[in-house]
Amino acid sequence: MNRKLNMGMVGGGKDAFIGAVHRMAANLDGHIQLVCGAFSSNPTKSSDTGKELYLAQSRVYATYTDMFAQEKLLPIGERMDFVSIVTPNHLHFEPAKLALENGFDVVLDKPVAFTLAEAKTLKEIINKTGKSFCLTHTYTGYPMVKEAKEIIRENKIGTIKKVYVSYPQGWLTTFLEGDGQKQATWRTDPAKSGIAGSMGDIGTHAFNLAEYVTGLQVTKICADITTNVAGRKLDDDGTVLLKFNNGASGMLYATQVAAGEENNIRIQVYGDKGGLEWKQEDANTLLVKWLDKPVEIYRAGSSYLSPLASFNCRTPAGHPEGYLEAFANLYRNFALSLIAKNNSTEAPEFCSDYPGIEEGIRGMAFIENVIASGKSNDKWMDFSI
């Protein structure tokens, strides 16, 4: 196969936020082209979106079930190779399940499902079908996050003792859903978002970042979950104490009522030799701190970075790289892995470095454990899956 991968999309219609981000990211490296979509539960909106994206109307579908049924009848090379699912949380599992069962590989926006049970079922289907699966935890795509991961993997800062990860936003400080704002309305609705609000929306990103960078797994939690805004049905703020499988302790907080904050996700990790710090709002910089010497400043695009980080840099040092490029790294790695798989060849080094179903299951377990802990009077709870 010497061609671009054909991508279909479920969700991401006009006025949606994340669908356009996925399309731009998928397009950045030239390995993927959008060929079809079921962009909305409203057939007219789906059709209008297809027109805006210059798609043939015969490849714009009223439902995702129609799309999967029709696309699999087309010859390989013309039909979609994989589908990107960018719907609200309650519409993740069924499209992903049906796509896999119809022979399509899947890229899925997080969280992986509506419940932990659904996530486990999805894993069974992936294993049964042998199809490829990517979960878009965006922040693992940043080059300096990967540099932090490599520094820890090589034991440069020693045995990990403390992990702090935070994700403050401020956009839900007021009762925005009461005004009918689209993003706020579904994200604060238990029927569409699930049992968690902020902890499901951004807490899962912080949790995934902590486990990805450190290479550790959370084993115990103690959560304090709060709803600050009157009338809101789900949590908008929370703090979680963490215990890791090497004995390290940590803290995670995720809030969407920190007035004035934007998307300030940040991680600090401390070992017995040194520590490191990265934050998305200065994404090209990684601080490495030492017990007995000055702080070192690592910059994206520099020649001294690890091979893993360098593979995920796109521009020379000093040229900003950000959210879209991090997203694109996930799509690029998935695409090159899938092309190699389809050609029965070996994928380029580092291309397997993207989140999958295991990260999805742990993310859903995080949500369910945190909400259970927040409702409990117990000091600590085991992190159960």
Predicted feature residues:
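Beta-loop-alpha module in the N-terminal Rossmann-like domain of NAD(P)-dependent dehydrogenases
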Residues: 59-125
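N-terminal Rossmann-like dinucleotide-binding module
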Residues: 1-55
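Glycine-rich, aromatic-lined ligand/substrate-binding cores of catalytic
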Residues: 202-284
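Hydrophobic residues in well-ordered beta-strands that form the structural core
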Residues: 108, 133-135, 278
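A short helix->loop->beta-strand "cap" motif at the edges of active sites that frequently abuts
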Residues: 57-58, 102-104, 129-131, 248
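C-terminal helix-rich "cap/oligomerization" subdomain common to oxidoreductases
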Residues: 1-4, 333-385
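C-terminal glycine/acidic-rich active-site capping loop/insertion
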Residues: 212, 239, 244, 273-354
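Predominantly a Rossmann-like dinucleotide-binding segment in NAD(P)-dependent oxidoreductases
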Residues: 132, 139-232, 286, 377
